[in-house]
Amino acid sequence: MFNLYSLIMHDFTLLSTGAVLCTVGLLVLLFFFREKILRYKCLRFWESNAEDHQNIEAFLKNYGSYAPKRYNYSEVKRMTSCFKNKLGQGGYGSVYKGTLQNGSHVAVKVLNGLKGNGEEFINEVASISRTSHVNVVSLEGFCFEGCKRALIYKFMPNGSLEKFIYEERSDSVRQLGWPILYKVALGIARGLEYLHRGCTTRILHFDIKPHNILLDEDFCPKISDFGLAKLCMKKESIVSMLGARGTIGYIAPEIVCRNLGGVSHKSDVYSYGMMVLEMVGGRKNVDVGVDRTSEIYFPHWLYQRIELDEELQLIGIMNEEEKECARKMVMVSLWCIQTDPSNRPSMSKVVEMLEGKLDSLQMPPKPYLYSPSRSEVDSLEVGSYQCSRSNV
């Protein structure tokens, strides 16, 4: 009995020792792999920073005296009074109001050092540096100092178009009257026409939306935020793209569903059309919170009104001239949001239609309901394409 007990205890001790040794060994392996992963990430971080630095230096060398001014981080802190006056914040970082030495006001976009690998930053600097147009925001300078990055723009007193579209007022009066809305829509169209045709290198924006349209003191619109832009030669009708670019609600169908057509400058046309419809309605194009289900998809509801030659019932229309202006903006936008890219007009044609007479516009085909979900965009980014299109 005693020998049996001793044998059992001996085996138990061996098992316990073995379990402890296995646990220690496993912990050592986990620690080893953790250190290796951290070392790899650290190495990639510094390699990425070094690559970004080389790209910036190459950019400055190529542009010479035409490159925007480069500021160091201490100058950025000084012009923003140590980041005292914050204008806004987003996933990219924060925007602060600043003042240059000559007294001019600027908006300083300080990028989040943890977001992205610097590609969007370099992309924006390179894109805007190629532009010079009244309807495109001007880059006053930039800061690139290690992981500290900032973009310095001319200050726009009226902020983004977004706040003038969706913010409700108790008296149900539009914040922007129809003459200004038309002026803004036409200005954005001219800015996009310039990006597509007026630059030596064609610039496709890929993120046209109210938030990215800034307004100066006279409500002159400026296209901003070129972080997702793509540069291509004018002779290129179709561009290659590895992942989805843009914002849900404004993304052209072909960007998510490649079988619908090639990605091109017509993708910006679609985003423009969706944005102008929101300007017209003072609401999101897809809104499940409306009273009547027929109004959930705003473009379809507007199409029905025009097809039946009924009043658009839009807020703030005071006379026949404004009624014609609103109807024209809707008609042009419905052409812009056609699912087939080949059916959409170029931005040059959009400008022509907006400047022309309403009775010269033909009735566009009925629009399809197309609104990609976040899961569809995510699936595109990992290489699979899904599509959702329905006639409503």
PLM-predicted stretches and their roles:
Residues 1-6:
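Extracellular/luminal ectodomains of secreted and membrane glycoproteins with large N-terminal domains
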Residues 7, 11-392:
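Conserved eukaryotic protein kinase-like
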